[in-house]
């Protein structure tokens, strides 16, 4: 008889402000969600926190226009509101909170006559993997980004090629990178695929945590369940908004045809929103394919002349990442409920290092943390609570972590699990 092995307690993911201010990075690498200041975090704490919402009528009536779709209130501190298809939304207040407990808000906003000015710590306010690990040798560090977004973005006559480094920013202040790894190959698919955690991010050499593809862990103003157009999840450095994957009820933007088809930059225009971009899960270029607008050069690391033209997919071959996780059963779950799931493992695929004995000490599917973890043979049984506002209809990644004597062992399965709406 195989006796189920329970996982050891999850690592404490909170650190004192002294450590953060002096080191600007965390010794165990995992970044905390918005959780209590002491003790081991409770499961899914960030996933169940309320997301930003529409603004009440009184606040809207008192807001003053700045430029384009941007408005500001006279409150202290002021709210920056964005007009999204006729709705006024507060995109940033929820993400401005001091989630790393260093006394500095994640985001600080101001504006001038032409730009929204954003100071960002580049700090993800959702659960991440512990870095460094067997899939990535780098640590996550707090940043001091300063970005300028055009308040009234303008279309360009040419497509500007995406540089390396940050190309845009999610609502939480974490940056998007283009889909290529340092050597110039596709980082998301094929032989050159790199290890991303289940929130689709990882740190590079200087500690910048960033996304290469759709980060379902970023809170957006409205539920993104495939029943309507997706909400805004970030902005490109030309000032145009980046939306989630859905174009309309049951239709992903990547599958839209005729006049709604996405261009080479992953963007299109409609009467309500004007020109905007969409993320395209599972399809290159995943976030942006180029800048269709006039890019704000001060945001870019690259100096000098920028090239023209959209980027092209250069993926080839099969991924070299060990496919230790074979599947999750069942592969779907409805929102607003707690579920018992089984993560199936194949130890023969652990070619870089043997699969550790015992239960993993961390399992995460998209933004959802396992509340309990047990292992019986090659089956890892977990319980996961899916919050009512979870993103639905999009395949989520799963990663697991083992605490070992050396570097933490991590394994990943892409497109492993899907949240469904209640009546599917």
Question: What is the predicted function of each stretch?
Answer:
Residues 385-392:
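Short, surface-exposed loop/turn segments at beta-strand-coil junctions that are enriched for proline
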Residues 376-383:
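Aromatic sugar-binding surface patches on proteins
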Residues 189-194, 206-254:
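Short helix-loop boundary/capping segments
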Residues 39-190:
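Solvent-exposed N-terminal domain segments of exported/luminal and surface proteins
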Residues 1-11:
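N-terminal secretory signal peptides that target proteins for export/translocation
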Residues 259-321:
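Long, compositionally biased interface segments
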Residues 316-360, 407-424:
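Beta-strand/beta-sandwich contexts
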Residues 145, 149, 170-175, 205-218, ...:
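Extracellular/lumenal glycan-associated surfaces
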């Amino acid at each position: 008889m195989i006796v189920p092995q329970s996982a050891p307690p999850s690592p404490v993911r909170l650190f004192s402000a002294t450590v953060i201010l002096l080191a600007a990075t965390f010794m165990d690498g995992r970044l905390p969600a918005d959780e209590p200041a002491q003790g081991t975090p409770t499961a899914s704490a960030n996933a169940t926190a309320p997301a930003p919402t529409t603004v009440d009528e009184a606040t809207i009536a008192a807001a003053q226009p700045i430029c384009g779709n941007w408005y500001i209130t006279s409150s202290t501190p002021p709210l920056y509101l964005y007009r999204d298809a006729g709705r006024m939304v507060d995109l940033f207040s929820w993400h401005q909170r001091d989630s790393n407990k260093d006394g500095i808000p994640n985001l600080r906003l101001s504006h001038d006559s032409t730009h929204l000015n954003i100071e960002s710590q580049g700090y993800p306010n959702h659960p991440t993997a512990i870095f460094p690990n067997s899939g990535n040798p780098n640590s996550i560090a707090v940043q001091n980004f300063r970005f300028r977004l055009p308040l009234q973005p303008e279309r360009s006559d040419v497509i500007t090629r995406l540089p390396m480094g940050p190309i845009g920013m999610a609502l939480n202040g974490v940056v998007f990178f283009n889909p290529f790894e340092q050597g110039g190959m596709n980082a998301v698919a094929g032989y050159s695929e790199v290890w991303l955690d289940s929130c689709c991010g990882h740190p590079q050499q200087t500690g910048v945590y960033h996304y290469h593809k759709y980060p379902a862990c970023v809170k957006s103003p409205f539920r993104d369940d495939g029943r309507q157009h997706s909400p805004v999840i970030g902005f490109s450095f030309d000032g145009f908004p980046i939306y989630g994957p859905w174009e309309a009820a049951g239709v992903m933007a990547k599958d839209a045809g005729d006049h709604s088809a996405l261009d080479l930059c992953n963007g299109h225009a409609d009467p309500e929103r004007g020109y905007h971009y969409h993320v395209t899960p599972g399809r290159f270029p995943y976030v942006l394919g180029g800048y269709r607008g006039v890019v704000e050069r001060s945001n870019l690391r690259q100096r000098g002349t920028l090239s023209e033209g959209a980027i092209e997919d250069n993926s080839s071959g099969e991924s070299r990442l060990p496919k230790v996780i074979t599947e999750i059963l069942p592969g779907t779950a409805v929102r607003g409920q707690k579920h018992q799931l089984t993560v199936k493992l194949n130890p023969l695929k652990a070619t870089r290092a043997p699969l550790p004995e015992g239960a993993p000490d961390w399992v995460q599917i998209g933004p959802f943390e396992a509340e309990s973890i047990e292992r019986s043979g090659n089956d890892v049984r977990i319980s996961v609570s899916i919050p009512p506002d979870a993103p639905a209809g999009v395949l989520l990644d799963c990663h697991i972590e083992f605490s070992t004597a050396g570097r933490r062992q991590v394994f990943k399965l892409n497109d492993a699990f899907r949240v469904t709406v209640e009546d599917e």
